[in-house]
A protein has these predicted regions:
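OB-fold and OB-like single-stranded nucleic-acid-recognition modules
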Residues: 18-176
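Sec-dependent bacterial lipoprotein signal peptides
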Residues: 1-18
């Protein structure tokens, strides 16, 4: 009997260790489209209006207010296992805007940081990026996971960067 319990405990530990890590609570992602067609989203953003989606991006502009933070991002692809970060783009991609109705620490808002967001799509909005006003796909974040890479590093560069050994700081933010 003890041997069976020991085998069961070992198998449970092994299976748990092999499980795919998740970024967000299942209550946040249960109704989510994990990798929506971004080309359609850009061509006709209102097609996804009212949908819950998971998007990935690189921060290019941040505008804070008392209500929260508006992030304008370069779209990146979501990989098979989102917890490992977005897929880096070798060429410039389209942009989108996401509003996080809460507080994100200053290091989480650095230009170049990569993020994954679980969000509700809204109507496209006019956003100001470096003085140019453009209509962009617009979402309101439920939860957001940020890899604090800054603009000079990719997620894959950590923990061994040219500056030495630094573990990659990352954090998940969920609105209450």
């Amino acid at each position: 009997m003890r041997m069976i319990a020991l085998v069961f405990a070992s198998l449970s530990t092994l299976l748990t260790a092999c499980a795919t890590p998740t970024l967000f609570p299942s209550s946040v992602t249960s109704d989510m489209q994990l990798n929506p067609d971004f080309g359609v989203m850009v061509a006709d953003p209102d097609v996804f209006k009212g949908s819950a989606v998971q998007l990935a991006g690189r921060i290019i502009d941040v505008q804070t207010s008392t209500n929260g933070t508006l992030i304008v991002a370069q779209q990146l692809s979501v990989q098979k296992y989102p917890a490992y970060g977005p897929v880096e783009a070798s060429e410039p991609t389209t942009q989108f805007a996401v509003f996080y109705p809460g507080t994100i620490d200053p290091a989480g808002l650095w230009t170049g940081n990569k993020f994954m967001v679980a969000a509700d799509m809204k109507e496209s909005q006019m956003v100001n990026v470096d003085g140019a006003i453009k209509r962009e796909p617009y979402a309101v974040a439920r939860c957001m996971h940020v890899w604090k890479t800054g603009q000079y590093y990719d997620i894959a560069d950590f923990p061994h960067s040219t500056d030495g050994y630094y573990p990659l700081e990352e954090q998940t933010y969920c609105r209450k």
